[in-house]
């Protein structure tokens, strides 16, 4: 697409970043001064009843700046990147038709990629192949399968944690079915996003600062009643650790504590470590992201002004 035709497209803003980087606060501040409507891009915030551990915006924040695509699934339900793309495009069209600008905010980079580039023609799931992978995992462990993926598709392996069996088995399954790696196939995208997108990423200047923010927020969640929230989910009886919702960072570790598998202190340690690992994967995505402008989360006022400098002209 040439620059002239691209300039004629409706405008959209991406505000991306690792967990605990201040994305939500910046998005809310921007909504006060720009004609934008917020769309959440977060695979955990979609779930009802999962508020504290996901750092979901509170009632006052949502009143000041409503977020779309929050609380749209029960924790027992699945939600894919394809589901997100469909829902986000519908919301973006509605916002644009009302003469406003969609501001998509979150840290689920796979969703941003699916929205921006379209979805790749990946092979359908094969129960027989998946069963063989799971049998191999039972015999050798998921760490061994992750090492196998590193040899087959090092790019995908860098983004998939060894403790994420769903994504790990899918990456291997795609290769065994098609003979092509997940990375190869995802480079062949579907329909690109029909918007002129201004992309921003917000993060602290150093990894140490991000780690401090992560640890502080995890302890704030605990003080706010995170354990009671997960106990309520546990008491339902229909949820388990094979579900994407319960595998969310923090929830998986608290679940293990409630089941008596680990101590409270171990839960806290693992929860903080898992959140740091998530942030590392998010930063890996973002460092390779084209066309993104970086903002410093330690200076939110300056970050807001930098966005306004770029976006102010398109909002007039």
From Swiss-Prot:
Reactions listed under catalytic activity: adenosine(37) in tRNA + dimethylallyl diphosphate = N(6)-dimethylallyladenosine(37) in tRNA + diphosphate
Region described as Interaction with substrate tRNA: 42-45, 166-170, 247-252
Class of enzymatic activity (EC top level): transferase
Site (Interaction with substrate tRNA): 108, 130
GO molecular function terms attached to this record: ATP binding; tRNA dimethylallyltransferase activity
Amino-acid positions noted as binding substrate in the UniProt annotation, renumbered to this chain: 19-24
Domain of life assignment: Bacteria
GO biological process terms on file: tRNA modification
Essential cofactor(s): Mg(2+)
UniProt cross-references to Pfam families, sorted A to Z: IPPT
Binding positions for ATP per the UniProt entry: 17-24
Membrane-crossing segments per the record: none
Keywords from the named record: ATP-binding, Magnesium, Nucleotide-binding, Transferase, tRNA processing
EC number annotated for this UniProt entry: 2.5.1.75
Quaternary structure and interacting proteins, as annotated: Monomer.
Family statement drawn from the similarity comment of this UniProt entry: Belongs to the IPP transferase family.
The protein's role, per its UniProt record: Catalyzes the transfer of a dimethylallyl group onto the adenine at position 37 in tRNAs that read codons beginning with uridine, leading to the formation of N6-(dimethylallyl)adenosine (i(6)A).
Record-given protein name: tRNA dimethylallyltransferase
Annotated gene: miaA
């Amino acid at each position: 697409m040439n620059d002239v035709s691209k300039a004629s497209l409706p405008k959209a803003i991406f505000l991306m970043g690792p967990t605990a980087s201040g994305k939500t606060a910046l998005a809310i501040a921007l909504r006060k001064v720009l004609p934008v409507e917020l769309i959440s891009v977060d695979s955990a915030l979609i779930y009802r009843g999962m508020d504290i551990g996901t750092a979901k915006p509170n009632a006052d924040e949502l009143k000041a700046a409503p977020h779309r695509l929050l609380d749209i699934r029960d924790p027992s339900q699945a939600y894919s990147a394809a589901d997100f793309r469909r829902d986000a495009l519908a919301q973006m069209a509605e916002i644009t038709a009302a003469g406003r600008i969609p501001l998509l905010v979150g840290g689920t980079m796979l969703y941003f990629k699916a929205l921006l580039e379209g979805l790749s023609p990946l092979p359908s799931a094969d129960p027989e192949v998946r069963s063989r992978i799971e049998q191999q995992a039972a015999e050798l462990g998921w760490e061994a399968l992750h090492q196998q993926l590193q040899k087959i598709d090092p790019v995908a392996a860098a983004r998939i944690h060894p403790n994420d069996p769903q994504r790990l088995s899918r990456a291997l399954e795609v290769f065994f079915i098609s003979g092509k790696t997940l990375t190869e196939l995802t480079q062949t995208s579907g329909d690109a996003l029909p918007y002129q997108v201004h992309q921003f990423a917000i993060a602290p200047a150093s990894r140490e600062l991000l780690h401090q923010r992560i640890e502080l927020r995890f302890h704030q969640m605990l003080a706010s009643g995170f354990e009671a929230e997960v106990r309520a989910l546990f008491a339902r009886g229909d949820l388990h650790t094979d579900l994407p919702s319960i595998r969310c960072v923090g929830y998986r570790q608290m679940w293990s504590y409630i089941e008596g598998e680990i101590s409270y202190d171990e839960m806290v340690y693992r929860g903080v470590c898992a959140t740091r690992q998530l942030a590392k994967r998010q930063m890996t995505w973002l460092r390779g992201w084209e066309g993104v402008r970086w903002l410093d989360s330690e200076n939110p006022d300056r970050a807001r002004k930098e966005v306004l400098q770029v976006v102010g002209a398109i909002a007039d």
